[in-house]
Amino acid sequence: VAHVGHCHPKVVEAQRKQSGLLNTNTRYLHPELVRYAERLCGLFPEPLNVCFLVCTGSEANELALRLAQAYTQAQGMVVVDVGYHGHTKSLIDLSPYKHNGPGGKGAPDSVRTTPMPDLYRGVYRESHPDPGSAYGKKVIEHAESLANSRAGLAGFICESILSCGGQIVLPENYLKTAYAGIRKLGGLCIADEVQVGFGRVGKTFWGFELQGVVPDIVTLGKPIGNGHPLAAVITTAEIAEAFAN
């Protein structure tokens, strides 16, 4: 995703300058990595202040899943119908767009799929007095089912705007309702900003801000590197520490 255009002179110059100084992977720290991570974290509300740098959106969502499962010591995830989060095996399991598509084998028992919050063709439409809350309660129903299962509830992952689902803007109160229920049950809330982050929604820098919520984990990709292999996961110190230990 060439977020600021192909061959943008500032991007080209920054890349040229850095390749002339140092070219290494993110396993080894150097000042530019730290400086970038600090600037990136500065764009998020507290307590989102820990940054993990990776190479692709799939890696970011894979790491987010591992963080949630490590923190909660549970495996189960609630996902949104037609959602897409990546192409690794575990992410295909979380992506109805893939596992319910051609050649797909459906979701495993540890994954529950909640209806897409579509006000045009969905279960609850614009005529409903509060469709966002109604859809959010559906998320909670699936979360309760997981919490009472052998898998347990690790969390809920949702794109801040449903991309492959048809560029569906989430209805008001959807994430507020869903997040409150997920957290009450001990799960974590993951905002997938891989496709829509970095100001692509217009009004705000991050899509989740349109819903007036603060996720526990945010994943970034595509526009972050303007087409170059860069992605990130932003989370809290508490969640990061649980993963490190």
Where in the sequence are the language-model features?
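Conserved N-terminal phosphate-binding loop of PLP-dependent enzymes in the Aspartate aminotransferase
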Residues: V1-N245
